[in-house]
Amino acid sequence: MKKLAVLGDFLEPHHHAQIDSTAARCGFAVDYYPDGHVPAELAGQYEVLYGMPDRAALRTFTSLKWFCGSFAGVDAYLDDALYPSPDVILTNSSGAYGVTIAEHLIMVTLMLLRHASAYVLEAAAHRWGPVLPMRSIMGSTITVVGTGDIG
């Protein structure tokens, strides 16, 4: 049976269920490595790798056909010399982080409007001075410019 290695501990149980189901339909067995590392003596049995492996470890995946990074940018993994074969297919997880980035945008906007970084510094120094002026997003017009799922 073909094998898939999934690296990292960031997946929720429903992700595991979906990966297991899809892999089984495609004839793959799945092994999870929450610590992000596949022992070198086992790496050669995997045709598919998902996660963010150490670049130096990629050559130990001697049967590797497809590496899918668990992130959007794969620039650090573009060098063919990293892989046991120049035929390894490299893909990313672009599109998986839209909700996370949207929520991050709201969080950072509120932090800026409420001077969160200044308050953290003041609290760390045990200074409880006057309240800094704060703005609300209520009634504001906000424009977000970008392209794609996270832009």
Name each region found by the language model.
Residues 1, 87, 138-141:
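Phosphate-coordination loops involved in phosphoryl transfer and adenosine-cofactor binding
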Residues 1-48:
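N-terminal glycine-/charge-rich "phosphate-binding" loop or analogous flexible N-terminal tail
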Residues 45-123, 134-135:
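Phosphate/diphosphate ligand-binding glycine-rich loop within oxidoreductases
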Residues 119-151:
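Glycine-rich NAD(P)-binding loop of Rossmann-like domains
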